[in-house]
Curated annotation (Swiss-Prot):
This is Peptide methionine sulfoxide reductase MsrB. Its cofactor is Zn(2+). The keyword Metal-binding applies. Signal peptide: none annotated.
Amino acid sequence: MSNNQDRPGQITDESLRERLSPEAYAVTRRAGTEPPFSGRYYDHHETGIYHCICCDAPLFSSEHKFDSGSGWPSYWQPVSGDALSVVRDTSHGMIREEVRCARCDAHLGHVFPDGPPPTGLRYCINSLSLDFKAAHK
């Protein structure tokens, strides 16, 4: 899955169903949520960049990752200001801010106003929506 070379406009639902696990497809295309403490990146400490599992867009840097205690990978900011889109989510009887990949519209997770300085934000992201690429040493 880490060698995705699809470009915007070329990613089809069929190609994602073939390439992604059923769980990753449910999270990214159906706005699902993985169980807390189950994802491969919630306790991950390597240096590098977390990319979108669907389109390979860079999303988050390990430099901005922190342990929120939530059971999901958490970041206080994205890798760039245009990496994400945020939309209002009123599902499950709550009002939240849903985080999506700006390139391919994959569901990533949610952002909350309870993170650390300097932003005060907590991007709570499903591991299943991410693909980590280690920094070159």
